[in-house]
Amino acid sequence: MLSIQEIMALIPHRYPFLLVDRIVELEPGVRAVGEKLVSANEPYFQGHFPGNPIMPGVLILEALAQTGAVAALSLPEHAGKLVLFAGIDGARFKRVVRPGDTLRLEVQLERMRRGIGKGQARATVADQLACEAELLFAVTDPTK
């Protein structure tokens, strides 16, 4: 299990854009499972939607990407690197995510060649599928 401090040591995201609260399972370079405790205090709920708060789908995808970045950057050879989105394929949203939900974020990295990787991602709430997608990413030097 990784705490929020350990996550922040691996990825550069910070409030309000750090969307993973903890990592509950980690196989470096292979797989990560994270959790996001969705609070009514999230800044995006002010406008999405007043009186009917729903977590934006793009932020669910970002939370999945951050979980995948933790899996990739936990490899010693990727220490100090930056993971960037290279693409999203087949994204599907199956359930709304609301304040009070615990979003479970599962990313399985399938392939990594010359700094480009692919992973299968799923987000669930109470074992119900909320989102699934194939994520493409690039591991790069943060100064480039």
From Swiss-Prot:
GO terms for biological process: fatty acid biosynthetic process; lipid A biosynthetic process. It is an enzyme of class 4 (lyase). One of its GO terms (molecular function) is (3R)-hydroxyacyl-[acyl-carrier-protein] dehydratase activity. Its EC number is 4.2.1.59. It comes from the Bacteria. It comes from Chloroflexus aggregans (strain MD-66 / DSM 9485). Belongs to the thioester dehydratase family. FabZ subfamily. InterPro entries: FabA_FabZ, FabZ, HotDog_dom_sf. It is found in: Cytoplasm. This is 3-hydroxyacyl-[acyl-carrier-protein] dehydratase FabZ. It catalyses: a (3R)-hydroxyacyl-[ACP] = a (2E)-enoyl-[ACP] + H2O. GO terms for cellular component: cytoplasm; membrane. Involved in unsaturated fatty acids biosynthesis. Catalyzes the dehydration of short chain beta-hydroxyacyl-ACPs and long chain saturated and unsaturated beta-hydroxyacyl-ACPs. Keywords: Cytoplasm, Lipid A biosynthesis, Lipid biosynthesis, Lipid metabolism, Lyase. Its main location: cytoplasm. Transmembrane segments: none annotated. The active site is at H48. Pfam families: FabA.
